[in-house]
């Protein structure tokens, strides 16, 4: 496939997640409800780095701006003051501090922003109205399609936004204000769907063309865009969800941003043909909305659903998700998808190297031998040579096949948030490794 853009990261082998920092406080006007400070974020980042064995991680911070998540879009120029560290003069300084410190832990700090939503409390809102950069009803009035944080949420008209020069002005200001984020080479743009405009009429296709120009402009600054969805809009797609149902894209419509957006948080409505022809290095998923595909291909765990101050067991939950979802996702992403067969729950995918992944039972085999059996696994850790991750949710004891003929011994390490702990050496006999796995403990195993 001839790619229009070259990405800064191979997202198919990174760990990409959000961290929720703050939301507007609905009970106290002009206040922010802090979920996690910059200081606390770094503490999580250190522990996650140990759990994930130092692989490259990209964190998109949610609620870093103004009063928190979804506040004052389409502006994104001020750091949330409630997140400031005591020892810093400004919240901006604290944000920059976190970005610098995270690099020590193989972690990239960036932001979760939005090019679609517009609220009337944004300083630039009047400019959007005057520039024709908002979706309008047939009567010419801006159309508040959704509602968040108790405020009407208007949508930007991508064509008007781009052609008016307003998009370039907004993004230039963002990149100039936060050079350390621009240097990260990646941002997450939430809900980047296209909507029809009715005054003047602008079709979905025209909006898609403008969206491509917006993505290309961001890339001209050296920055990749990841986003929320797989974008497969058609002109028959309604602007507003009907009867409260999700605004869903059609499976029959082509993927519009392949080669432009390398990763989506929610991947869905892809055909089997698209799944086979689109390499994860070009486009990969956080998770699939379709359970069957999620059980076959795995993906990038939504760590932000786990890493919360009100979750006292987040470490065990994180190790579980990393071992049973992230590790198999990275492993399968390293292989070529050859064929998808079966139907519904009996669906499976054949990969290169003799690997088959089954939806039923969430099993993975190599040359007919089990390497993942539901929540029990002994899988290659593709980031390090001759290294495996072993885990069992309910405990397990069995022989696992070793496919490397020259290995005679295995060093076993327990994975913890404070670093790996050496456990023991285990001999490899006749390409078999006998391991007793206590429940809910992750192990890193290095073959010698």
Give each language-model segment a name.
Residues 23-129, 208-212:
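Aromatic- and glycine-enriched glycan-recognition loops and surfaces
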Residues 10-12:
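Non-catalytic protein-protein interaction scaffold segments in large eukaryotic complex-forming proteins
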Residues 1, 15-39, 115-118, 122, ...:
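Active-site-proximal substrate-binding groove within the catalytic cores of carbohydrate-active enzymes
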Residues 1-8:
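Extended acidic/polar, glycine-enriched regions
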């Amino acid at each position: 496939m001839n790619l229009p853009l070259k990405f800064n990261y191979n997202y198919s082998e990174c760990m990409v997640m959000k961290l929720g920092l703050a939301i507007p406080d609905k009970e106290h006007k002009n206040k922010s409800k802090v979920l996690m400070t910059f200081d606390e974020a770094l503490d999580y980042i250190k522990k996650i780095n140990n759990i994930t064995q130092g692989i490259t991680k990209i964190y998109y911070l949610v609620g870093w701006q103004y009063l928190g998540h979804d506040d004052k879009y389409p502006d994104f120029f001020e750091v949330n003051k409630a997140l400031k560290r005591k020892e810093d003069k400004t919240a901006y300084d604290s944000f920059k501090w976190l970005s610098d410190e995270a690099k020590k832990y193989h972690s990239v700090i960036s932001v979760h922003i939005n090019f679609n939503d517009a609220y009337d409390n944004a300083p630039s809102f009047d400019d959007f109205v005057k520039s024709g950069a908002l979706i309008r009803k047939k009567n010419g009035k801006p159309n508040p399609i959704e509602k968040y944080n108790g405020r009407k949420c208007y949508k930007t008209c991508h064509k008007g936004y781009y052609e008016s020069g307003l998009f370039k002005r907004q993004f230039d200001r963002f990149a100039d204000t936060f050079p350390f984020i621009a240097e990260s080479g990646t941002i997450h743009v939430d809900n980047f769907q296209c909507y029809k405009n009715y005054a003047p009429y602008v079709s979905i296709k025209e909006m898609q063309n403008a969206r491509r120009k917006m993505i290309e402009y961001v890339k001209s600054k050296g920055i990749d865009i990841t986003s929320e969805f797989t974008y497969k809009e058609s002109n028959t797609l309604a602007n507003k969800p009907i009867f409260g149902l999700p605004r869903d894209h059609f499976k029959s419509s082509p993927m519009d941003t392949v080669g432009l957006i390398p990763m989506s948080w929610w991947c869905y409505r892809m055909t089997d043909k698209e799944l086979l022809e689109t390499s994860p290095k070009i486009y990969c998923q956080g998770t699939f909305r379709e359970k069957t595909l999620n059980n076959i291909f795995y993906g990038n765990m939504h760590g932000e659903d786990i890493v919360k101050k009100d979750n006292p067991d987040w470490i065990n939950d994180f190790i579980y998700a990393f071992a049973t979802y992230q590790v198999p996702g990275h492993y399968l992403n390293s292989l070529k998808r050859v064929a998808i067969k079966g139907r519904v729950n009996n669906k499976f995918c054949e990969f290169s190297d003799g690997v088959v992944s089954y939806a039923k039972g969430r099993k993975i085999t190599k040359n007919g031998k089990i390497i993942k059996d539901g929540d029990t696994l002994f899988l290659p850790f593709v980031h390090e040579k001759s290294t495996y991750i072993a885990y069992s949710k309910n405990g397990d004891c069995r022989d696992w096949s070793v496919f490397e003929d020259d290995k005679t011994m295995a060093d076993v390490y327990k994975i913890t948030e404070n670093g790996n702990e050496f456990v023991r050496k285990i001999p490899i006999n006749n390409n078999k490794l006998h391991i007793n796995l206590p429940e809910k403990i992750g192990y890193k195993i290095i073959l010698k």
